[in-house]
């Protein structure tokens, strides 16, 4: 339903193999695949998975993707459904999911932000999670602006 709501005849769908199979269309990207979309636009598929014991059944390692979109010199990390992963570096804008049991706790999102050090953080997927905990926990991080948007 979400894709249908915004899709046009020119929409290019890029998905991990599992989602590609469910959609029965689109271009498949696996962890570590890189796609050059234009001269100054690159998309990298990065791992997205649960790390908390007992939660790995929701997003097992190797199945799902997050993405790093590079536009010119700006690197945007869209984490997908994942928990705190320490390997992300040189990120300008980060979109991090905050909603246990499927993604990060507020504390994990705070730690991930402190490691990644993006200029801008957009927490998302937070449902009933008190997202202000993330903003409060990062209030002393002078290099990161936390932007919270109410999305439908």
Regions found by a protein language model. Name each.
Residues 6-8, 19-24, 69, 86-91, ...:
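Alpha-helix C-terminal capping segments
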Residues 10-18, 120-125:
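Short internal beta-strands
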Residues 24-37, 41, 110, 114-152:
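Binuclear metal-ion centers of metallo-dependent hydrolases, dominated by the metallo-beta-lactamase
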Residues 1-15, 90-95:
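Active-site metal-binding motif and surrounding structural segment of the metallo-beta-lactamase
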Residues 65-132:
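Metallo-beta-lactamase
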Residues 1, 14-22, 30-33, 82-83:
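Short, polar loop motifs at secondary-structure junctions
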Residues 26-90, 104, 150-152:
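Core dinuclear metal-dependent hydrolase active-site scaffold
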Residues 18-20, 31-35, 48, 98-102, ...:
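Short, acidic/turn-prone active-site loops that include or flank metal/cofactor-
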């Amino acid at each position: 339903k979400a894709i249908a709501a915004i899709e046009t005849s020119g929409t290019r769908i890029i998905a991990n193999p599992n989602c590609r199979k469910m959609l029965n269309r689109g271009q498949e990207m696996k962890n570590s695949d890189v796609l050059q979309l234009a001269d100054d636009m690159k998309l990298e598929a990065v791992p997205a998975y649960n790390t908390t014991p007992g939660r790995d059944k929701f997003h097992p390692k190797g199945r799902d993707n997050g993405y790093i979109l590079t536009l010119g010199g700006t690197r945007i990390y869209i984490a997908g459904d994942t928990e705190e992963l320490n390997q992300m570096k040189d990120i300008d804008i980060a979109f991090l999911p905050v909603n246990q049991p499927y993604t990060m706790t507020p504390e994990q999102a705070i730690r991930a932000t402190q490691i990644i050090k993006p200029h801008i953080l957009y927490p998302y997927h937070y449902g009933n999670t008190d997202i202000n905990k993330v903003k409060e926990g990062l209030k002393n991080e002078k290099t990161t602006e936390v932007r919270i948007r109410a999305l439908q």
